[in-house]
UniProtKB/Swiss-Prot annotation:
Name of the coding gene: GATA10
Primary localization: nucleus
ZnF segments: GATA-type: 214-268
UniProt keyword list: Activator, DNA-binding, Metal-binding, Nucleus, Transcription, Transcription regulation, Zinc, Zinc-finger
Protein's job: Transcriptional activator that specifically binds 5'-GATA-3' or 5'-GAT-3' motifs within gene promoters. May be involved in the regulation of some light-responsive genes.
Family according to the record: Belongs to the type IV zinc-finger family. Class A subfamily.
GO cellular component, one term: nucleus
One Gene Ontology term of the molecular function aspect: sequence-specific DNA binding
Protein name stated in the entry: GATA transcription factor 10
Cell compartments where the protein resides: Nucleus
InterPro entries: GATA_TF, Znf_GATA, Znf_NHR/GATA
Length: 308
């Protein structure tokens, strides 16, 4: 899209070529031409340009395609020739102001500034930076996620009890679903039962041996039992009652209806080993005549005495 018509553009070009434009430019710049030596200056400039070396290619990276490429539908802007010197002057003034302000703002070396200005961020560098930041975060999180364990205590483990040492001659019989503790407690209960049976048999044998050694077979005068762990004093004298009857006699509760459950003369309808039940039975005897039952009991006692 043209800013000026073609006729006006041609007139401007003619004015520039005629030299009027450059005369006005020199008047505005006010640069005396007498100070410039035309003969020596040209030779020095040529020698200096010959000594210059071309810059390395790595210093200037390739420009992005967005700046170099131009869309097809977009129209190119044409700048008139009379505005080019004014643009050059404004650019040079901005550059000079930037140079004057940079030393106060930053004190970095020029090489670092140049490399920083021409440094371009590629996708690979962006990925590397992001990967580095993620790795530092992951390393920090891993340090926090795995704390250091403390020292282990030197506590001794509980010793397991071996049943083979306790009962070496008894084979252990356990069901598939039985645990170790259940088997241990069951074996202990079995051993206690055996001990009780052994103690009872031992007391019975000791009483029989003592009666045999005395030459007299002892019988309780109240319940007519033969076996007892201890003979006690009764109304007939010392060692005439069994242990249960002797305890009752000592407390004053020995009645005819009392019999221990192990007595051979124990009849459930007549006798009992509980004092409360005996009182209830006596109340019933007052209501019903129990003389016949008592006579039968006396006959049984007499028959037993004859047999002994």
């Amino acid at each position: 899209m043209n800013w000026l018509p073609e006729a006006e553009a041609e007139e401007h070009l003619k004015g520039i070529l005629s030299g009027d434009f450059f005369d006005g430019l020199t008047n505005h710049l006010d640069c005396p031409l007498e100070d410039i030596d035309s003969t020596n200056g040209e030779g020095d400039w040529v020698a200096r340009f010959q000594d210059l070396e071309p810059p390395p290619l790595d210093m200037f990276p390739a420009l992005p395609s967005d700046l170099t490429s131009c869309p097809k539908g977009a129209a190119r802007v044409r700048i008139p020739n009379n505005m080019i010197p004014a643009l050059k002057q404004s650019c040079s003034s901005e550059a000079l102001s930037g140079i004057n302000s940079t030393p106060h703002q930053s004190s970095a070396p020029p090489d670092i500034k140049v490399s920083y200005l021409f440094q371009s961020l590629t996708p690979v560098s962006v990925l590397e930076n992001s990967y580095g930041s993620l790795s530092t975060q992951n390393s920090g999180s891993q340090r926090l996620a795995f704390p250091v364990k403390g020292m282990r205590s030197k506590r001794r483990r509980p010793t397991t009890v071996r049943l083979s040492y306790l009962f070496p001659f008894e084979p252990r019989k356990s069901t598939p679903g039985e645990s170790v503790t259940e088997g241990y407690y069951s074996s202990e209960q079995h051993a206690k039962k055996k001990r009780k049976i052994h103690l009872i048999t031992h007391t019975e044998s000791s009483t029989l041996e003592s009666s045999k050694s005395d030459g007299i077979v002892r019988i309780c005068t109240h319940c007519e039992t033969i076996t007892t762990p201890q003979w006690r004093q009764g109304p007939s004298g010392p060692k005439t009652l069994c242990n249960a009857c002797g305890v009752r006699f000592k407390s004053g509760r020995l009645v005819p209806e009392y019999r221990p459950a192990s007595s051979p003369t124990f009849i459930p309808s007549v006798h009992s080993n509980s004092h409360r039940k005996i009182i209830e039975m006596r109340k019933k005897d007052d209501e019903f005549d129990t003389s016949m039952i008592r006579s039968d009991i006396q006959k049984v006692k007499q028959g037993r005495k004859k047999m002994v």
